[in-house]
């Protein structure tokens, strides 16, 4: 099988490193001339919105995926006309926007802190009055390694916070006091079969993941699998 990957960065590279020993071939579409995955497959150097090169990719591969959720949803929708794309466009639409993510969690009955859509400083001021402080403000899209977010602890932190995050659509979340963070990796096949890896406990330093250690907490594992199973089934994630 030849797999097309939107993005040729470190995540695409790791995908190819895992897939090549299994006999899979790869083609990467990435605008960067030095995309680090290019040594592991064909490199189509083009913008993610370049429909001519997207069509070329679709004609050369059996299936397409993407290495991160920052890919434009329009790219996936376009490719889906010509070749199977997994995860699907609906999964990407949700995963790339924190408002859609939180709304889905709420719809699925997964415990979620109170949150509000922020489109202006006035929105933020009103949301803070309703949700209270401390709270966490995040950009709705992008943001990683601690970027694109701000913890609001005091009234003075609220002043100018919308502009500080770039005056882009944001969400405000109620602050959750926590003792630790855990993550669960799951996979779901086209027929709906789902498998789960063991929970890992994460340690961050300055907003960047530093260490993940496998957990041995069966009750928490079962709860996490229940929540993740709901999230995967909702958009028919593959």
Please report, for each region that a protein language model flagged, where it lies by residue.
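Active-site nucleotide/adenylate-binding loops and adjacent lid/helix of ATP-dependent enzymes
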Residues: 94-183, 187-234
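ATP-binding N-terminal substructure of ATP-dependent carboxylate-amine bond-forming enzymes
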Residues: 1-100, 122
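Short, intrinsically disordered, charge-balanced linker/junction segments flanking boundaries
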Residues: 236-238
């Amino acid at each position: 099988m030849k797999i097309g990957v939107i993005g040729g960065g470190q995540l695409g590279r790791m995908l190819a490193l895992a897939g090549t020993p299994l006999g899979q071939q790869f083609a990467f579409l990435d605008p960067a001339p030095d995309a680090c995955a290019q040594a592991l497959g064909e490199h189509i150097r083009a913008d993610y919105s370049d429909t001519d090169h997207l069509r070329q990719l679709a004609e050369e591969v059996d299936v397409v995926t993407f290495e991160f959720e920052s890919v434009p949803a329009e790219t996936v929708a376009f490719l889906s006309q010509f070749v199977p794309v997994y995860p699907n466009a609906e999964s990407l639409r949700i995963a790339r926007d924190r408002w859609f993510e939180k709304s889905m969690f709420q719809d699925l009955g997964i415990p979620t802190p109170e949150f509000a859509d922020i489109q202006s400083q006035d929105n933020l001021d009103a949301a803070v009055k309703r949700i209270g402080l401390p709270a966490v403000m995040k950009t709705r899209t992008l943001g990683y390694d601690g970027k694109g977010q701000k913890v609001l602890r005091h009234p003075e932190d609220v002043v100018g916070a919308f502009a500080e995050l770039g005056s882009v659509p944001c969400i405000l979340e109620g602050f959750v006091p926590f003792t630790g963070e855990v993550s669960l990796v799951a996979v779901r096949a086209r027929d709906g079969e789902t498998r789960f890896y063991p929970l890992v406990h994460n340690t961050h330093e300055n907003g960047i993941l530093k260490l993940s250690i496998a957990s041995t907490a069966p009750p928490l594992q079962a709860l996490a699998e229940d929540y993740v199973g709901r999230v995967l089934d909702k958009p028919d994630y593959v």
